[in-house]
């Protein structure tokens, strides 16, 4: 299999974790965008229960914790990410109400109608946008909120190179109108949608990825598989520079409604 045809899913979880653990965020985003999404949510008190699903090392979670009351549980499949998450919470003095646990987003450790807010930045694709919306809904209280960022097509047609790349990486990627329709279908009332600005990719994701690559390549010097993985990250960056008018990330904020 050529490197051009590989996706992140073709590599060992340990390699993926080692690479991205050196980054504050494991996908496009920024503190400003996190807070913008949060501004559309009005149901939170010091009794609120919040879950950040696919939290990574918790960059966005710590931003949330600094601006909302309540208890926050971060969930991620990678123990290495959760170790960093909990260390960051302790360093910020948030450990009494912010904790990270190892778990899978397709088997969440919550009761039905337990959560006031489900948050997930750049992670719902791991289970699929539509599946995540449907399966996670039951954990929300009536009137609870979901806030997720997800990759979106901005046009119905796009060049074959970028279309083929994303069809290999994430075939469920869809256009904005279709994604909003999926929110309705899953039992949510869309409250706000907005496209993440370019600096969420260039300054807050790609720039930190360069530093992470240097650490990663030194650690895995001579490891061909690790070198292939590192090269794939560069391909993603280059494609965004060429085709950013055709796709990006969108934040979706929605409220659970009775069906």
Q: Which role does the model predict for each range below?
A:
Residues 117-130:
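A short SAM/SAH-binding and catalytic strip from SAM-dependent methyltransferases
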Residues 151-170:
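Short, glycine-/aromatic-enriched active-site segment of Class I SAM-dependent methyltransferases
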Residues 131-145:
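A short glycine-rich, Lys/Arg-flanked "PGG" loop and its adjoining helix->strand segment in the class I
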């Amino acid at each position: 299999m050529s490197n051009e045809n590989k996706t992140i899913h073709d590599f060992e979880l340990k390699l993926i974790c080692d690479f991205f653990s050196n980054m504050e965020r494991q996908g496009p985003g920024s503190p400003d965008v996190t807070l913008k999404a949060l501004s559309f949510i009005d149901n939170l008190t010091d009794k609120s229960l919040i879950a950040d699903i696919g939290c990574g090392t918790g960059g966005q979670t710590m931003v949330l914790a600094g601006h909302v009351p309540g208890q926050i549980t971060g969930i991620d499949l990678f123990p290495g990410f959760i170790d960093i998450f909990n260390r960051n919470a302790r360093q910020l003095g948030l450990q009494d109400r912010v904790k990270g646990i190892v778990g899978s987003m397709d088997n969440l450790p919550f009761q039905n109608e337990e959560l006031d807010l489900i948050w997930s930045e750049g992670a719902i694709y791991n289970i699929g946008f539509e599946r995540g919306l449907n399966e996670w809904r039951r954990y929300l209280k009536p009137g609870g909120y979901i806030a997720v960022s997800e990759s979106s097509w901005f046009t119905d047609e796009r060049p074959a190179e970028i279309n083929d790349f994303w069809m290999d990486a994430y075939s469920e990627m869809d256009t904005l109108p279709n994604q909003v329709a999926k929110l309705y279908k899953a039992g949510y009332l869309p409250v706000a949608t907005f496209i993440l600005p370019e600096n969420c990719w260039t300054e807050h994701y790609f720039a930190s990825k360069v530093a992470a690559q240097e650490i990663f390549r030194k650690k895995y010097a001579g490891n061909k598989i690790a070198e292939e993985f590192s090269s794939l990250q560069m391909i993603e960056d280059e494609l965004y520079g060429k085709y950013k008018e055709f796709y990006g990330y969108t934040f979706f904020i929605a409220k659970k409604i009775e069906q």
